[in-house]
Amino acid sequence: MSGFVPSEIFFTRGVGRGETQLESFEAALRDAGIAQFNLSSISSIFPPHAKMVSKEEGLKKLSPGQILFTVLARNTSNELNRMISAAIGYAIPRDKSKWGYLSEHHSFGETEKVAGSFAEKLAAEMLSSTFGSTSQLIYDKEKEEYVLEDKILTTGNISATAVVLSHDEWTTVVAAAVLIVE
């Protein structure tokens, strides 16, 4: 059976502000560089053999109006002084023929580091559960990644955080994994 499997993936984030929730979301997508595409939300599998590329490299391969598959974390508020966060975490196994995981996290009151670390840990736990256990999952501070019996090669995250600055303004944050099918 044949199907299309994304061959590349890039990560991006953005913050937007506007008079309406929709305007702030559009501004966040523009800040992330992906407003000109039709975004289709998918679940959280990092495809086997997919290569991580920079946002700039990924965007060069895309055309305005193109349908893009994304794992999108999004948070929005108009509550004055409210801190909002959105993060995507990823965990990729050493064996590139296996799939990895992407996780989305949306929170209030968390810094970029806290939200990103939570999303990264969640992705690592989801991946380690496919190996049968999360109890042996260890965070290697020196390498800044999660390791499970030498099976996880790479973990990481991207996150965006913002504070609502005005009571008459909406603020939106997005973090996205964009999957490219060639």
Swiss-Prot record:
Q: Which Gene3D superfamilies match?
A: 3.30.60.30, Pyruvoyl-Dependent Histidine Decarboxylase, subunit B
Q: Where is this site: Cleavage (non-hydrolytic)?
A: 43-44
- InterPro entries attached to this UniProt entry: Pyr-dep_his/arg-deCO2ase, Pyr-dep_his/arg-deCO2ase_sand, Pyruvoyl-dep_arg_deCO2ase
GO MF, one term, reads: arginine decarboxylase activity
Q: Which reaction does it catalyse?
A: L-arginine + H(+) = agmatine + CO2
What does the note accompanying the cofactor annotation read?
Binds 1 pyruvoyl group covalently per subunit.
Task: Name the chain's protein.
Answer: Pyruvoyl-dependent arginine decarboxylase
Task: Tell me the gene name.
Answer: pdaD
